[in-house]
């Protein structure tokens, strides 16, 4: 700490270190927040809380996208088919819920899926299979993968790419 406070380190270097630290901290907090929303969505039995979790997740992603000034895409990349089904179905239920309330659809609420999961496959076929679905994009209907922030929901974590 003494070195940090001494004049040996220029102010612009200190400022750069602080910016990098706070950017990493924001990313970590954002991932933790998304993990809590995924847990809320995956809890069976409490439909209202799961819908609220979907809404909160979308709101957080939209805000983060606006902060970054680039589109964010959530990708579900898990080996458990039931998790993929649950996340996808909760997003669809949220769309129906908005329709019932008379809400209008904006690009923020569009759903993108890159593959359809077949329900006819057996458990033996599913061993070692990774299901990859793009669940939602936040600010644009069309986007470039290289220009967007990818948020990956995996079996054990939520990460930013």
Swiss-Prot record:
Example GO biological process: symbiont-mediated suppression of host innate immune response
Record motif LXCXE motif, interaction with host RBR, residues: 111-115
Residues covered by region (Binding to host SKP1 protein): 9-21
Q: Which Pfam families match?
A: Clink (PF19411)
Q: From what superkingdom does this record's organism come?
A: Viruses
Task: Keywords in alphabetical order, please.
Answer: Host-virus interaction, Inhibition of host innate immune response by virus, Suppressor of RNA silencing, Viral immunoevasion
Q: How does it assemble?
A: Interacts with host SKP1. Interacts (via LXCXE domain) with host retinoblastoma-related protein 2 (RBR2). Interacts (via LXCXE domain) with human RB1. Interacts (via LXCXE domain) with retinoblastoma-related proteins (RBR).
Function, as annotated, reads: Interacts with and disrupts the function of host retinoblastoma-related proteins RBR, which are key regulators of the cell cycle. Induces transcriptional activation of E2F-regulated S-phase and G2/M-phase-specific genes. Inactivation of the ability of RBR to arrest the cell cycle leads to the stimulation of viral DNA replication. Acts as a suppressor of RNA-mediated gene silencing, also known as post-transcriptional gene silencing (PTGS), a mechanism of plant viral defense that limits the accumulation of viral RNAs.
Give the protein name, as stated in the record: Cell cycle link protein
For this protein's source organism, the top of the classification is: Viruses, Monodnaviria, Shotokuvirae, Cressdnaviricota, Arfiviricetes
